[in-house]
Curated annotation (Swiss-Prot):
Protein name: Large ribosomal subunit protein uL10
Transmembrane segments annotated in the record for this chain: none
Function: Forms part of the ribosomal stalk, playing a central role in the interaction of the ribosome with GTP-bound translation factors.
Signal peptide feature range: none
Molecular-function GO term, any one: large ribosomal subunit rRNA binding
Pfam families according to UniProt: Ribosomal_L10
Matching InterPro entries: Ribosomal_uL10 (IPR001790), Ribosomal_uL10-like_sf (IPR043141), Ribosomal_uL10_bac (IPR022973), Ribosomal_uL10_bac_type (IPR047865), Ribosomal_uL10_CS_bac (IPR002363)
One GO process term, biological-process aspect: translation
Species annotation: Rickettsia africae (strain ESF-5)
CDD domains reported in the protein's UniProt record: Ribosomal_L10 (cd05797)
Length: 169
Protein backbone atom coordinates (compact mmCIF):
# COMPACT_ATOMS: atom_id res chain seq x y z
CA UNK A 1 0.00 0.00 0.00
CA UNK A 2 1.35 3.39 -0.95
CA UNK A 3 1.94 5.97 1.75
CA UNK A 4 -0.60 8.27 0.07
CA UNK A 5 -3.29 5.53 0.30
CA UNK A 6 -2.90 4.94 4.03
CA UNK A 7 -4.80 8.03 5.27
CA UNK A 8 -7.73 7.08 3.04
CA UNK A 9 -7.67 3.51 4.38
CA UNK A 10 -7.56 4.78 7.97
CA UNK A 11 -10.51 7.09 7.24
CA UNK A 12 -12.51 4.13 5.85
CA UNK A 13 -11.86 2.15 9.03
CA UNK A 14 -12.69 5.17 11.21
CA UNK A 15 -16.04 5.47 9.39
CA UNK A 16 -16.75 1.78 10.01
CA UNK A 17 -15.96 2.19 13.72
CA UNK A 18 -18.18 5.29 14.00
CA UNK A 19 -21.14 3.90 12.04
CA UNK A 20 -21.12 0.36 13.44
CA UNK A 21 -21.76 -0.14 17.15
CA UNK A 22 -20.89 -3.84 16.73
CA UNK A 23 -17.50 -5.07 15.51
CA UNK A 24 -16.04 -8.57 15.61
CA UNK A 25 -12.32 -9.00 15.04
CA UNK A 26 -11.30 -12.22 13.29
CA UNK A 27 -8.30 -14.02 11.87
CA UNK A 28 -9.02 -15.30 8.38
CA UNK A 29 -5.75 -17.08 7.52
CA UNK A 30 -6.40 -20.07 5.29
CA UNK A 31 -9.85 -19.08 4.03
CA UNK A 32 -10.29 -19.42 0.30
CA UNK A 33 -11.57 -16.59 -1.87
CA UNK A 34 -14.86 -18.43 -2.34
CA UNK A 35 -15.27 -18.85 1.43
CA UNK A 36 -14.63 -15.14 2.03
CA UNK A 37 -17.06 -14.27 -0.78
CA UNK A 38 -19.69 -16.55 0.74
CA UNK A 39 -19.23 -14.92 4.15
CA UNK A 40 -19.44 -11.44 2.64
CA UNK A 41 -22.66 -12.31 0.80
CA UNK A 42 -24.34 -13.72 3.89
CA UNK A 43 -23.26 -10.67 5.92
CA UNK A 44 -24.42 -8.28 3.22
CA UNK A 45 -27.90 -9.81 3.32
CA UNK A 46 -28.03 -8.82 7.01
CA UNK A 47 -26.65 -5.31 6.38
CA UNK A 48 -23.24 -6.23 7.78
CA UNK A 49 -19.78 -6.19 6.27
CA UNK A 50 -16.40 -7.95 6.26
CA UNK A 51 -13.20 -5.99 5.71
CA UNK A 52 -9.62 -7.20 5.70
CA UNK A 53 -7.51 -4.58 7.49
CA UNK A 54 -3.87 -3.84 8.07
CA UNK A 55 -3.26 -4.07 11.81
CA UNK A 56 -1.31 -0.81 12.03
CA UNK A 57 -4.06 1.12 10.24
CA UNK A 58 -6.81 -0.54 12.30
CA UNK A 59 -4.96 0.43 15.49
CA UNK A 60 -4.57 4.04 14.33
CA UNK A 61 -8.29 4.19 13.50
CA UNK A 62 -9.18 2.66 16.87
CA UNK A 63 -7.09 5.26 18.69
CA UNK A 64 -8.71 8.06 16.66
CA UNK A 65 -12.21 6.89 17.59
CA UNK A 66 -11.54 6.23 21.26
CA UNK A 67 -11.63 2.44 20.93
CA UNK A 68 -8.24 2.02 22.61
CA UNK A 69 -9.46 -1.11 24.39
CA UNK A 70 -9.47 -3.18 21.17
CA UNK A 71 -6.01 -2.16 19.92
CA UNK A 72 -4.36 -5.25 21.43
CA UNK A 73 -6.69 -7.54 19.42
CA UNK A 74 -5.05 -6.59 16.12
CA UNK A 75 -2.30 -9.10 15.39
CA UNK A 76 -1.91 -11.57 12.55
CA UNK A 77 -4.10 -11.76 9.44
CA UNK A 78 -7.00 -9.64 10.66
CA UNK A 79 -10.43 -8.85 9.29
CA UNK A 80 -13.26 -6.99 10.95
CA UNK A 81 -16.94 -7.84 10.72
CA UNK A 82 -19.20 -4.89 11.39
CA UNK A 83 -22.92 -4.27 11.73
CA UNK A 84 -25.56 -2.23 13.50
CA UNK A 85 -27.30 -5.43 14.67
CA UNK A 86 -24.91 -7.32 16.98
CA UNK A 87 -26.86 -10.55 17.51
CA UNK A 88 -27.52 -11.35 13.84
CA UNK A 89 -23.90 -10.57 12.99
CA UNK A 90 -22.61 -12.73 15.84
CA UNK A 91 -24.85 -15.64 14.78
CA UNK A 92 -23.56 -15.48 11.20
CA UNK A 93 -19.90 -15.24 12.20
CA UNK A 94 -20.10 -17.97 14.86
CA UNK A 95 -21.91 -20.36 12.51
CA UNK A 96 -19.44 -19.62 9.72
CA UNK A 97 -16.50 -20.18 12.10
CA UNK A 98 -17.98 -23.54 13.16
CA UNK A 99 -18.18 -24.63 9.53
CA UNK A 100 -14.77 -23.18 8.58
CA UNK A 101 -11.95 -23.79 11.04
CA UNK A 102 -9.78 -21.16 9.34
CA UNK A 103 -11.93 -18.28 10.60
CA UNK A 104 -11.00 -17.55 14.21
CA UNK A 105 -12.96 -15.14 16.37
CA UNK A 106 -10.54 -13.02 18.39
CA UNK A 107 -12.85 -10.59 20.13
CA UNK A 108 -14.96 -7.56 19.47
CA UNK A 109 -16.84 -4.60 20.74
CA UNK A 110 -20.57 -3.99 21.11
CA UNK A 111 -21.77 -0.56 22.21
CA UNK A 112 -18.30 0.25 23.61
CA UNK A 113 -18.14 -3.00 25.62
CA UNK A 114 -15.18 -5.20 24.76
CA UNK A 115 -16.08 -8.86 24.24
CA UNK A 116 -13.86 -11.92 24.11
CA UNK A 117 -14.47 -14.96 21.91
CA UNK A 118 -16.64 -16.68 24.53
CA UNK A 119 -18.84 -13.59 24.98
CA UNK A 120 -19.39 -13.34 21.23
CA UNK A 121 -20.44 -16.99 21.13
CA UNK A 122 -22.88 -16.35 23.99
CA UNK A 123 -24.19 -13.25 22.18
CA UNK A 124 -24.94 -15.40 19.15
CA UNK A 125 -27.30 -17.54 21.25
CA UNK A 126 -29.55 -14.59 22.12
CA UNK A 127 -32.71 -13.84 20.13
CA UNK A 128 -32.44 -11.01 17.62
CA UNK A 129 -34.20 -7.70 18.12
CA UNK A 130 -36.91 -8.65 15.61
CA UNK A 131 -37.47 -12.00 17.37
CA UNK A 132 -37.86 -10.20 20.70
CA UNK A 133 -40.31 -7.73 19.17
CA UNK A 134 -42.37 -10.63 17.81
CA UNK A 135 -42.47 -12.30 21.21
CA UNK A 136 -43.55 -9.08 22.93
CA UNK A 137 -46.30 -8.45 20.38
CA UNK A 138 -47.47 -12.05 20.81
CA UNK A 139 -47.55 -11.67 24.59
CA UNK A 140 -49.46 -8.41 24.35
CA UNK A 141 -51.99 -9.81 21.89
CA UNK A 142 -52.67 -13.05 23.76
CA UNK A 143 -54.65 -11.55 26.68
CA UNK A 144 -56.61 -9.31 24.30
CA UNK A 145 -57.66 -12.23 22.11
CA UNK A 146 -58.73 -14.20 25.17
CA UNK A 147 -60.88 -11.30 26.39
CA UNK A 148 -62.46 -10.91 22.94
CA UNK A 149 -63.15 -14.65 22.81
CA UNK A 150 -64.86 -14.53 26.17
CA UNK A 151 -66.91 -11.49 25.18
CA UNK A 152 -68.05 -13.19 21.96
CA UNK A 153 -69.11 -16.37 23.76
CA UNK A 154 -72.79 -16.93 24.57
CA UNK A 155 -73.98 -15.43 27.82
CA UNK A 156 -74.21 -18.87 29.46
CA UNK A 157 -70.52 -19.43 28.74
CA UNK A 158 -69.75 -16.02 30.16
CA UNK A 159 -71.67 -16.88 33.32
CA UNK A 160 -69.69 -20.12 33.69
CA UNK A 161 -66.40 -18.25 33.27
CA UNK A 162 -67.39 -15.70 35.90
CA UNK A 163 -68.62 -18.50 38.21
CA UNK A 164 -65.32 -20.39 37.81
CA UNK A 165 -63.31 -17.26 38.47
CA UNK A 166 -65.38 -16.45 41.57
CA UNK A 167 -64.95 -19.98 42.94
CA UNK A 168 -61.16 -19.70 42.52
CA UNK A 169 -61.05 -16.65 44.74
Amino acid sequence: MLRSEKPVAVEDIVNIYKESPSIIITHYHGLTVSQVSSLRESLKSKEAGFKVVKNTLAKIAANQTGLNSIVNLFAGPTAIVYSKEPVEMAKLVVNFAKANDNLKIIGGIVDNHVLDEHSIKELSKLPTLNELRGKIVGLLQAPATKVVGVLQAPSSSMARVIQAHASKN
